[in-house]
Amino acid sequence: MTIFEKKPDFTLFLQTLSWEIDDQVGIEVRNELLREVGRGMGTRIMPPPCQTVDKLQIELNALLALIGWGTVTLELLSEDQSLRIVHENLPQVGSAGEPSGTWLAPVLEGLYGRWVTSQAGAFGDYVVTRDVDAEDLNAVPRQTIIMYMRVRSSAT
């Protein structure tokens, strides 16, 4: 006799939790909480030291594959002193978030912040900004988050 075990599905729980967090504490507090969760996740699984952005991208994609959280493309923009981070296939928590379906995006901000700053010679005091205009205009595939990581003193 074959017994099929259903794996737990946390979708309903996460959707309800996302709505409650947003209602109870508001968007700003929620975003900071999720960034901190991302930093914690980044501490639990860290990339090895990488000498190039290309090698770091390969290592980050290997870590993302472990947790089933999509893929990333990194591009160093030396003229802006920034790192362009394009994350594709972010898991969704239903339609939660702004734009819709991007509730977990602040987790990525914390995650990439931890991972990138763990590298030798990386940004120290940094800020991560999302390109929500591109996300809103559907200029990128659904579940794609575009972020820029800059040294805080040169951020606008």
UniProtKB/Swiss-Prot annotation:
It holds the Pfam family Cellsynth_D. Keywords: Cellulose biosynthesis. InterPro entries: BcsD_bac, Cellsynth_D_sf. Pathway: Glycan metabolism; bacterial cellulose biosynthesis. The keyword Transport does not apply. One of its GO terms (biological process) is cellulose biosynthetic process. GO terms for molecular function: identical protein binding. The keyword Transferase does not apply. May have a major role in the perfection of crystallization, involved either in the pore structure itself or in the organization of the pores within the linear array of terminal synthesizing complexes (TCs). This is Cellulose synthase operon protein D. It comes from Komagataeibacter xylinus. The gene is acsD.
